[in-house]
Amino acid sequence: KQNYHIVDGIDKENPHMVEGKEVSVVYDDGRHYIRTLPKDRKFDIITSDPIDPWVKGCAALNTVEYYRMCRDHLKPGGVMSLWIPLYDSDIETIKSVIATFFQVFPNGMVFSNEINGKGFDAVLLGQVEPTVIDLDKLHEKINSQDYARGRESLMEVGYGADIANIAWRPNMWGDAEVALLATYAGRAADMTGWMKNAQINRDSNLRLQYLAGMSMGTHKETEILNGILKYYRFPDDIFIGSSGR
């Protein structure tokens, strides 16, 4: 019953994702589920939102082997996303998480969160194929009526125009996708220097469970993000579109 309440929450924040028969609740350990799936069971998106890395058991959801399982169940063009907290952590811990993810997704990217405090969280995105985001197509889609509720959700959490100004500034709807993509912080190819000497987390060593938790109560999230941003290069081969974009 509690899981269905979670689904209700997803529907509120991500409209159209859980309507009708599109959602089935599976009662299983996430890693066990993905490992025992038939090889031909593929997904457009696999999102991994494990608990904080210092919690017992979380290291097993951040290993090379686990990411490979997820990668092998992506459809062509499919995406895997991973949430990572930068708070209560240190550089070595975050290096381990990111470098491990990039071992499996060498085209991976980092998106930061600077809406409500710099560097508090980050999201990793990975595709098997090189990622290309057409800004013109994205703008057209996100400003269409079919995506109106999704666009509104983005704006409610700070991407685009102030929610209070929506009624009298409808032209600001288009800012949502720009604000979202502006959180791009880096990619694997540009971050090799930052990841130097990172400890790769594997099933055989679970290094993350020994690294995480050593910086509880500290506030190094801004320092960590600034370190990543030193290697920032604008990804003109990822973000494409007309000159006006």
Predicted regions and their residues:
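The AdoMet/dcAdoMet-binding core of the Class I SAM-like
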Residues: K1-I98, F102-P106, V110, G117-G119
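Soluble small-group transferase modules, centered on the S-adenosyl donor enzyme superfamily
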Residues: H5-V23, D28-T36, D40, M109-R245
